[in-house]
């Protein structure tokens, strides 16, 4: 059975690409036709590519791999946060800070600062500090949480990135490629598919389309985790084999 149906894709508007004047010729193989000045994506190919992305994600998660969800455009922000949290993964849904991957040590220092201020808030330090200082610390905490909250528990570089709109997230794409980190991407008709390891040709502007595809990647991770748990339970409950000596 397919991971996703043609009906689901149609209902979410996954097939609507960009205007024909705003396209990347490299996406030609994923385009079905043109209608009223808009390219229509070939959903038969999208179904296959979603399946490929699902299996890639599931296999990676089954091996303990960590995936960073990236989508900073308005249409993606909520889905990226919700689905990454649902599947226990990391996310960036505000501005991508240059060096998030390539200057990971510096980012870790900022995350440490975030956690230090959180501790101060929790252990009562705020109560004994001057009001003015507390206001400044709260502002700093809010800013750090906004940009780093989704990766504050990411102790190492991710094993893959799931990106919505690689054109918008070109800095993230460049950093991942520099470090040979594989990229799964929702790629619209105006993007360059050659930069992405696992391409999902789809509308990256419709909230419903983004939500549907992002939730499928989260489902793949959860399926892998469920498989691990079931294997552990089976191992624990398996009867011990007795060895008999002749």
UniProtKB/Swiss-Prot annotation:
Extent of the signal sequence: none
Segments forming a coiled coil: none
Residue ranges with Acidic residues bias: 229-239
GO terms for cellular component: cytosolic small ribosomal subunit
GO term, biological process aspect, one: translation
Domain of life (superkingdom): Bacteria
KW Calcium (keyword) present: no
PROSITE patterns the record matches: RIBOSOMAL_S2_1 (PS00962), RIBOSOMAL_S2_2 (PS00963)
Alphabetized Gene3D superfamilies for the sequence: Glucose-6-phosphate isomerase like protein, domain 1 (3.40.50.10490), Helix hairpin bin (1.10.287.610)
Key words of the record: Ribonucleoprotein, Ribosomal protein
One example GO MF annotation: structural constituent of ribosome
CDD domains linked: RPS2
Region annotation Disordered: where it falls in the sequence: 226-246
NCBIfam families linked: rpsB_bact
Entry-linked PANTHER family: 30S RIBOSOMAL PROTEIN S2 PROKARYOTIC AND ORGANELLAR, SMALL RIBOSOMAL SUBUNIT PROTEIN US2M
Subunit structure: Part of the 30S ribosomal subunit. Interacts with BrxC.
UniProt similarity note: Belongs to the universal ribosomal protein uS2 family.
Protein's recorded name: Small ribosomal subunit protein uS2
Protein's organism: Bacillus subtilis (strain 168)
């Amino acid at each position: 059975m397919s991971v996703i149906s043609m009906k689901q894709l149609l209902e979410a508007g996954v097939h609507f690409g960009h205007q024909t004047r705003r396209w990347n010729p490299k996406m030609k193989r994923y385009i079905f036709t043109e209608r009223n000045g808009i390219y229509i994506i070939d959903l038969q190919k999208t179904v296959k590519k979603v399946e490929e992305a699902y299996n890639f994600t599931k296999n990676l998660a089954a091996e303990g791999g960590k995936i960073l969800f990236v989508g900073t455009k308005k249409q993606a922000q909520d889905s990226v946060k919700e689905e990454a949290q649902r599947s226990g993964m990391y996310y960036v849904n505000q501005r991508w800070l240059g060096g998030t991957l390539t200057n990971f040590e510096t980012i870790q220092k900022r995350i440490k600062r975030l956690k230090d201020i959180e501790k101060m808030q929790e252990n009562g330090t705020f109560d004994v500090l001057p009001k003015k200082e507390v206001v400044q610390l709260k502002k700093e905490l809010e800013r750090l949480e906004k940009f780093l909250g989704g990766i504050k528990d990411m102790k190492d570089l991710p094993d893959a990135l799931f990106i919505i709109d690689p054109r918008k997230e070109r800095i993230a794409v460049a950093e991942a490629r520099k470090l040979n980190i594989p990229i799964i991407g929702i790629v619209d008709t105006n993007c360059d598919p050659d930069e992405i390891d696992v391409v999902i040709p789809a509308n990256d502007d419709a909230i419903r389309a983004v939500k549907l595809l992002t939730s499928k990647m989260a489902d793949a991770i959860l399926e892998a985790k469920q498989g691990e748990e079931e294997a552990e339970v089976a191992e624990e409950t398996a009867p011990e084999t007795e060895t008999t000596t002749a």
